[in-house]
Amino acid sequence: MKTWVKIVFGVATSAVLALLVMCIVLRPSRVHNSEENTMRALTLKDILNGTFSYKTFFPNWISGQEYLHQSADNNIVLYNIETGQSYTILSNRTMKSVNASNYGLSPDRQFVYLESDYSKLWRYSYTATYYIYDLSNGEFVRGNELPRPIQYLCWSPVGSKLAYVYQNNIYLKQRPGDPPFQITFNGRENKIFNGIPDWVYEEEMLATKYALWWSPNGKFLAYAEFNDTDIPVIAYSYYGDEQYPRTINIPYPKAGAKNPVVRIFIIDTTYPAYVGPQEVPVPAMIASSDYYFSWLTWVTDERVCLQWLKRVQNVSVLSICDFREDWQTWDCPKTQEHIEESRTGWAGGFFVSTPVFSYDAISYYKIFSDKDGYKHIHYIKDTVENAIQITSGKWEAINIFRVTQDSLFYSSNEFEEYPGRRNIYRISIGSYPPSKKCVTCHLRKERCQYYTASFSDYAKYYALVCYGPGIPISTLHDGRTDQEIKILEENKELENALKNIQLPKEEIKKLEVDEITLWYKMILPPQFDRSKKYPLLIQVYGGPCSQSVRSVFAVNWISYLASKEGMVIALVDGRGTAFQGDKLLYAVYRKLGVYEVEDQITAVRKFIEMGFIDEKRIAIWGWSYGGYVSSLALASGTGLFKCGIAVAPVSSWEYYASVYTERFMGLPTKDDNLEHYKNSTVMARAEYFRNVDYLLIHGTADDNVHFQNSAQIAKALVNAQVDFQAMWYSDQNHGLSGLSTNHLYTHMTHFLKQCFSLSD
């Protein structure tokens, strides 16, 4: 999510002798009284209006030294780094003529697609209307126009071929003005999905709106077909403005239910009618039972890599397949299958990592757990067992950005041993022994401790985007020397706007409790005084593979609560959270709802021992998985919490999606893990809400965590005759957007102020 550095090693009172504290003060308070008198606290209106939001700059790379970007006046501009020249390739007038909100340049630079009429569907998916603009004659392409609305559209990597998905079928155009060639014919709404994922694959496996992939030179097009014919359907009412509500139906496999059947096909787009789509075989050890397809990576035009998972998700198989021209088929020999298995949890982190192939087109780099249980980069040439470990240590490699002939760029949380930081590293792989350099560790060190990067072709240039803890900044760098070339975005307006704001202080610390490390971020009022007592709000997510304690910049609702309302807010990363090794990550395997809750409670007790927390005014709140954890913490019977809020909580793992739930819990069957499914519900603890103030919130059109979850909590509380508060948002999904957002945060603020006896 979201400077001077000070290390404090404290020896505390006898009550906390077991507590080791390491502290970074991220936002020191201003000390000049004359300045303080002219400064104001944050207001809720500031947050709801997005007054202090920041900008980032990610170049839209189109070559090794060129990128596109949209200027402040909405012209599409091409910038050449080496010449320093820029020119407008598409005017704002052309964009405005079709109300375009997005664009895409064809690789041959002859055409641009313009996207308008954006209509959101689920988390990543949306439909839109597309227009093709011919840059050579300055006119829109007429004749054989694209149908509308389109579910997905993309250019081939070379030339100006187009592939698009319309009404769940895939179409191909050799040129934008040509008639389309229909590749699939069996697409049906909510039944068969071609080239786009169904709900569960979009949300829980692919994390994209598309399921088709061009080969590097555009010869082949691979795509997934998802068959949801036998999947149970979730149905909910959408009230709208009509006399009768309409019913939304989504094929949605819950834990233990039948899953979509997935198949992968590849078609030669040069002569698509000649042979037609060819199916890629599934590895035998995967195909013998229920399985998932997890990703596809093209290696060359005639070599492709597919990744598969068993339904249990502790075994992943990477399969490298080659095109056999004589048979016009794809061959996936067993000798090119690489197996990744976890014996202590699930395979990978949240997802199984994807390979980054080297220039020999057979060996690759991949992140997976080493023998010490930390996720690191490995080089695989023949088998996973013979993999060469590239990085090592009690920290984790996060992402491989780019591999060139002589360098590998990646991110990790190694520097100074803070798991909530991200720095960019370069390893020289063209020399022996390989040398490692941290590109970002000492760049604007006080301001920037959390980076990501975007690379041009061959890593000739790259952009760094720093997310904090100071105000975010985006910069352009030479990929050979790492020298900074220019600042792309430094958020000067935001910096000036914050000069007269009393921001809260932020500290990142860690607790060592019973051989478990609990990192936490504490947000303190601007005039914080350790001799005083403050109300405490715990903000929790706590889901497997998540991380809340990060060195990022944010001015948000909890910033306001600290700045204006004088609350202390804490975020704690307990067992099950990511980037601190498998021991912590896999501790929650097959027992969700236990250690995540225990660790929040443990942290609260340690906070009380620090002496500045009013133990009679402690609250907890969370959203989604965080709503589940906050509910269980409130119902723990500890007496620690006076009140709490759950927004769109899961209430029983039998109600949630199969792909996500079974990854961490196994199956809800008697011979697997049904007992813990039953024991981990919020409803089973209804009686324990009697001594807390509980606010339950949900959107009625939540496609992700269904309203069913909160309805069952409410029913259990009513049956137990427990008083509680509830707020629902009609026709709102999991994100509670638009005017609902303002209402939500205003309502939650009133609830907390009433709980803590704070005046309006």
From Swiss-Prot:
GO terms for cellular component: apical part of cell; basal part of cell; cell surface; cytoplasm; extracellular space; focal adhesion; lamellipodium; lamellipodium membrane. GO terms for molecular function: dipeptidyl-peptidase activity; endopeptidase activity; identical protein binding; integrin binding; peptidase activity; protease binding; protein homodimerization activity; serine-type endopeptidase activity. It is an enzyme of class 3 (hydrolase). It comes from the Eukaryota. Gelatinase activity is inhibited by serine-protease inhibitors, such as phenylmethylsulfonyl fluoride (PMSF), 4-(2-aminoethyl)-benzenesulfonyl fluoride hydrochloride (AEBSF), 4-amidino phenylsulfonyl fluoride (APSF) and diisopropyl fluorophosphate (DFP), N-ethylmaleimide (NEM) and phenylmethylsulfonyl fluoride (PMSF). Dipeptidyl peptidase activity is inhibited by 2,2'-azino-bis(3-ethylbenzthiazoline-6-sulfonic acid), diisopropylfluorophosphate (DFP). Cell surface glycoprotein serine protease that participates in extracellular matrix degradation and involved in many cellular processes including tissue remodeling, fibrosis, wound healing, inflammation and tumor growth. Both plasma membrane and soluble forms exhibit post-proline cleaving endopeptidase activity, with a marked preference for Ala/Ser-Gly-Pro-Ser/Asn/Ala consensus sequences, on substrate such as alpha-2-antiplasmin SERPINF2 and SPRY2. Glycans are attached at N49, N92, N99, N227, N314, N679. Pfam families: DPPIV_N (PF00930), Peptidase_S9 (PF00326). Optimum pH is 6-8.4 for gelatinase activity. At pH lower than 5 inhibited gelatinase activity. Induction: In fibroblasts at times and sites of tissue remodeling during development, tissue repair and carcinogenesis. Up-regulated upon tumor stem cell differentiation. Up-regulated by transforming growth factor-beta, 12-O-tetradecanoyl phorbol-13-acetate and retinoids. It comes from Homo sapiens (Human). The active site is at S624, D702, H734. The gene is FAP. Changing A657Q: Inhibits endopeptidase activity. No change in dipeptidyl peptidase activity. Changing Y656F: Reduces dipeptidyl peptidase and endopeptidase activities. Optimum temperature is 37 degrees Celsius for gelatinase activity. Temperatures above 50 degrees Celsius inhibit gelatinase activity. Its EC number is 3.4.21.26, 3.4.14.5, 3.4.21.-. This is Prolyl endopeptidase FAP. The chain crosses the membrane at residues 5-25. One of its GO terms (biological process) is negative regulation of extracellular matrix disassembly. Changing E203 to A/D/Q: Reduces dipeptidyl peptidase and endopeptidase activities. Does not inhibit cell adhesion, migration and invasion. Inhibits dipeptidyl peptidase and endopeptidase activities. Substrate binds at E203, E204. It catalyses: Hydrolysis of Pro-|-Xaa >> Ala-|-Xaa in oligopeptides; Release of an N-terminal dipeptide, Xaa-Yaa-|-Zaa-, from a polypeptide, preferentially when Yaa is Pro, provided Zaa is neither Pro nor hydroxyproline. Changing R123 to A/M/E: Reduces dipeptidyl peptidase and endopeptidase activities. N-glycosylated. The N-terminus may be blocked. Residues 26-760 are extracellular.
